[in-house]
């Protein structure tokens, strides 16, 4: 079988993951991460030919600078690899009601992504930058760009999960409902959990926790999403890096009426100044919170609120499992690496039969998967996500 090399771009709110993947066998030829956008330490790391490299992007750099570096520095050193690219796959957080599966990028698709910006104000603009840069840098692949939507996996949610208790006309006429996010990741780790448990995906009941700068929990019953913590936008749900997650909607009225904040100021507060950043008043980085948990009140406060919220979601989703929960799965940058988050969260769920194994938990970090609970416990797993592989496979399939 001939190779099908796909350039995968995953533009997050504060980072950009990229890879060249052979969609036929999953082999990664180049992979990397640009992170700490808008901060002094903005940087890019990548792996090629077994070697690791790193470079500073410059203080305050973001998506455009990172993409320029990828095209003009990294790929420029591998012209033969660039010449073999057959498609470009883009991770898109929000497709609204318009997109229920992956699609080839057209002007209509770009407009649809723009129309969904109010639903994903941190992410969709970043995705559009990625698409624009890809179209500019690879004109020979102009009709081979594919958008893969994080909202697609959640389209199986039943009405009782996706509807808000608002006038029904707001859903019918304006699409105001719960959509979820991180669907590509939740789908991937569900597939992997099924393999580990030696079960068909359609018989699998798991609760998947994708924890990164953004975070969400998904209830997967019989292999399909039946509920998820993010809502109309990626602002609902868990405590995140800079996002508040769930809060009393009347707080917004209070901030506006009693404190004189404008709608734009409130939007900025909830999406960019809250979460771990708001609770610590120092940083959105979970590594700071974990490293300083025992010594700094701000770190302990942030960690405790973060894990309390996460445990509540996991606990509530057990009610949707029809009496059988096969495992809880942790993934994403925090889920895969923050052993303390996993331990503090599962310690709150002893009633459900979870008992952490400290040594296993510490071993399952830095890209390593594994069981993190004792043999006598209900199962909890760490499974490193691979959204890029799912995106590459979809891109190859649609452009074949």
Curated annotation (Swiss-Prot):
Cofactor notes: Mg(2+). Can also accept Mn(2+).
The main location class comes to cytoplasm
Gene3D superfamilies xrefs: 3.30.420.40
Q: Which cofactor does it need?
A: Mg(2+); Mn(2+)
Which positions are annotated as binding ATP?
A: 17, 210-214, 285-287, 333-337
Can the keyword rRNA-binding be found in this entry's annotation?
A: no
Q: What is its EC number?
A: 2.7.2.1
> Any idea where this protein resides?
Cytoplasm
The cross-references to InterPro entries, in alphabetical order and at most eight, read: Ac/propionate_kinase, Aliphatic_acid_kin_short-chain, Aliphatic_acid_kinase_CS, ATPase_NBD
Query: Site feature Transition state stabilizer: at which residues?
Result: 182, 243
What cellular-component terms does GO give this entry?
A: cytosol
Alphabetical GO biological process terms: acetate metabolic process; acetyl-CoA biosynthetic process
Keyword line = ATP-binding, Cytoplasm, Kinase, Magnesium, Metal-binding, Nucleotide-binding, Transferase
Q: Name one GO molecular function term.
A: ATP binding
Binding positions for Mg(2+)?
Answer: 10, 387
Q: In which pathway does it act?
A: Metabolic intermediate biosynthesis; acetyl-CoA biosynthesis; acetyl-CoA from acetate: step 1/2
Q: Which reaction does it catalyse?
A: acetate + ATP = acetyl phosphate + ADP
Describe its assembly: Homodimer.
Could you say which protein family the record assigns here?
Belongs to the acetokinase family.
HAMAP family assigned: Acetate_kinase (MF_00020)
Say what the protein does: Catalyzes the formation of acetyl phosphate from acetate and ATP. Can also catalyze the reverse reaction.
Q: Which NCBIfam families match?
A: ackA
Query: Know the name of this protein?
Result: Acetate kinase
| Gene symbol of the encoding locus | ackA
